[in-house]
Amino acid sequence: MATDNARASSYDDPMSERLLGIAADVLRSFGSGFGGHHLAIVGGAVPGLLVEVPPTGIEPHVGTADLDLHLSLHLLDGETADYYDSIIDGLRSLGLEADIEGDRHIKWRWVGRHRNARVQVELLCPVRTRGGRPEGPASDTPAIANMGPSGEIAALAVGFGHLVPEDTIAVERRVETASGNLTYQFPLAGLASWLCLKSDAIMRRDKAKDAYDVVWTLDALGPAAASDRVASSPLVAGDSAGELEAQLTLLVADQFRDIDSVGPTQYAAFLEGGAGEGERRHALGTVSEFARALAERGVI
């Protein structure tokens, strides 16, 4: 599995090539009752779902060996009580168990081997003190939300996760599942909420792939088309419009302000260009064009 300090050449896990088929296996293991109403794919799997085939001249996206699933507060708050067991049973049916670090069980990260690939599923959720749902911290850490009465599973709270449920979209892909080929409808974070999550990740951790994912996605969609997607998000006209504007402004005007900013620098580092000025200028140019397009559409 690639680490936070990994570069493009580190992403050689077999799951990178079969991620979507394995992702479908994971989601299908939860059962038909789940639908796409309470979870969405976030993280590094999103670019490959948003862009099925990159335009000529753009290298294929360097995939991820992790599957990040964002769960709704409705699920965590017990309004969908039967789903806890569905998630646990589904993950275990694929040979996954809660990860262990030392003597501590990481109940929001499940790992194992499925179809001869090492699989890692991370369960994420909104910060629970938002949206009129204040409550005390969970038993382990304020960033962890326990799920269900058994204490067997949890979710890790992430910044701006509360934007995802309103901005979840569905994307169909023909994939190779464990049961055969299938056209599967994947629920995933829309571009607007996903960029907010990525911007928050760039702020809070030193993982070069976050910046790479942003630049690659904007390149592959095209800055103008990407801004159209953001402008059409229900978040733009909703109660979270101010948060969306502020977080996107942070991304384009601070994290990608100039070639020495963290965004271009991490993008170049991920591509193993080190401090390569060409890679940094490319990243800056792509995000700057996206920023201009957002401004033209009145998003920022």
Task: Put a short name on every predicted segment.
Residues 1-300:
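Compositionally biased terminal segments of proteins
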